From Swiss-Prot:
It comes from the Eukaryota. ATP binds at A67, Q68, S69, G70, T71, G72, K73, T74. It is found in: Cytoplasm. One of its GO terms (cellular component) is cytoplasm. This is ATP-dependent RNA helicase eIF4A. The lineage of its organism: Eukaryota, Fungi, Dikarya, Ascomycota, Pezizomycotina. One of its GO terms (biological process) is cytoplasmic translational initiation. Its EC number is 3.6.4.13.
Length: 396
């Protein structure tokens, strides 16, 4: 009966059944070396989801949290995992699954950074890397393993990733993982875990396939919904530039380059082909840009992200696949060369620019065909996208 509520909630939203909040990290009874790591990482106070979800996870409940990127969800489960593992035991105690390699690596970085003062090992188990390296790393018994479903499933099947000591199983962006066709592997992984494993599931949307996972594999879960209005479109100035024809976007972008000094920017296009085309065109006009999309191999993508993070490349042109995996603190400007094909991706793209109160600017190139989509986005996020003012340079 408990899950009845899940079925009839409007627009794929879950209904919260838990509303206790703890509004400072100090009050969460965390290990002192973990608390030190949290503050050293730069967190000052918990975000909305952290205030609600960390405690029930630490207390051992199964938890479903509905939240988008940019809400601090990665740190929510990273902190909870680090609090719960026994650093003296050299075996995998927490398994975290993510839909893309980039996101898995980003999660690994957060776990390692927050766990900096604890004696923990966290291994990223992802496709596109050497299987032999994975086997070796897993034999050392890292307490936390984060990975993509395909490779994790493979390592469990080959008995290199042992599941008998696992206490926690975290599924991040569950909607994305299931929509990418990982359902079978995820179900298999569930079957191979100890019965007592605690399950934490995070998802921006709650379609039927995600709800099925929650009913099949979770016990009386705590449900937490972080509403859209708590997301980080706050502090992000959103503008549009009306572009009469698609062909004129390139000149518009060049003009924009002349007007503003860009510290770091991400430009989103809707297709891989367009990313390559735009990169060539801008390079031909002597702009320094780097590009990234799903056709590239892992080593290339890693190198490009590294250059972008370090600031040696300033402008990154990317597709939506990477909107969820790019977390660069200095991004001051996001340009939607193409408006996203679905409104949910809008927040994944621009919610980066001003994460956790950092200010950012988003500029949308809008042709006559895009006006309807822009209105939909405004309505969906209860936000206003204004025409770009002349003095935009002062805002970035």
């Amino acid at each position: 009966m408990a899950d009845k509520g899940l079925e009839d909630v409007p627009e794929g939203q879950i209904e919260s059944n838990y509303d206790e909040t703890v509004d400072s990290f100090d009050e969460m009874n965390l290990k002192s070396e973990l608390l030190r790591g949290i503050y050293a990482y730069g967190f000052e106070r918990p975000s909305a989801i952290q205030q609600r979800a960390i405690m029930p996870v630490i207390k051992g409940h199964d938890v479903i949290a509905q939240a988008q990127s940019g809400t601090g969800k990665t740190a929510t489960f990273s902190i909870s995992v680090l609090q719960k593992i026994d650093t003296n035991v050299k075996q995998c105690q927490a398994l975290i699954l993510a839909p893309t390699r980039e996101l898995a690596q980003q999660i690994q970085k957060v776990v390692v950074a927050i766990g900096d003062f604890m004696n923990i090992e966290c291994h990223a188990c992802i496709g596109g890397t050497s299987v032999r390296d994975d086997m070796k790393a897993l034999q050392d018994g890292p307490q936390v393993v984060v990975g993509t479903p395909g490779r994790v499933h493979d390592m469990i099947q080959r008995r290199f990733l042992k599941t008998d000591g696992m206490k926690m199983f975290v599924l991040d962006e569950a909607d994305e993982m299931l929509s990418r066709g990982f359902t079978e592997q995820i179900y298999d992984i569930f079957q191979l875990l100890p019965q007592s494993t605690q399950v934490v599931l995070l998802s921006a949307t709650m379609p039927q396939d995600v709800l099925e996972v929650t009913t099949k594999f979770m016990r009386d879960p705590v449900r937490i919904l972080v509403k859209k209005d708590e997301l980080t479109l706050e502090g992000i100035k959103q503008f549009y530039i009306a572009v009469e024809k698609e062909e004129w976007k390139l000149d518009t972008l060049s003009d924009l380059y002349e007007t503003v000094t860009i510290t770091q920017a991400v430009i989103f296009c809707n297709t891989r082909r367009k990313v390559d085309w735009l990169t060539d065109k801008l390079t031909a006009r002597d702009f320094t840009v780097s590009a990234m999309h799903g056709d590239m191999d892992q080593a290339q993508r890693d190198l490009i992200m590294k250059e972008f993070r370090s600031g040696s490349s300033r402008v990154l042109i990317a597709t939506d696949l990477l909107a969820r995996g790019i977390d660069v603190q200095q991004v001051s400007l996001v340009i939607n060369y193409d408006l996203p094909a679905n409104r949910e991706n809008y927040i994944h793209r621009i919610g980066r620019g001003g994460r956790f109160g950092r200010k950012g600017v988003a500029i949308n190139f809008v042709t006559a065909d895009d006006v309807r989509m822009m209105r939909e986005i405004e309505q969906f996020y209860s936000t206003q996208i204004e025409e770009m003012p002349m003095n935009v340079a002062d805002l970035i």
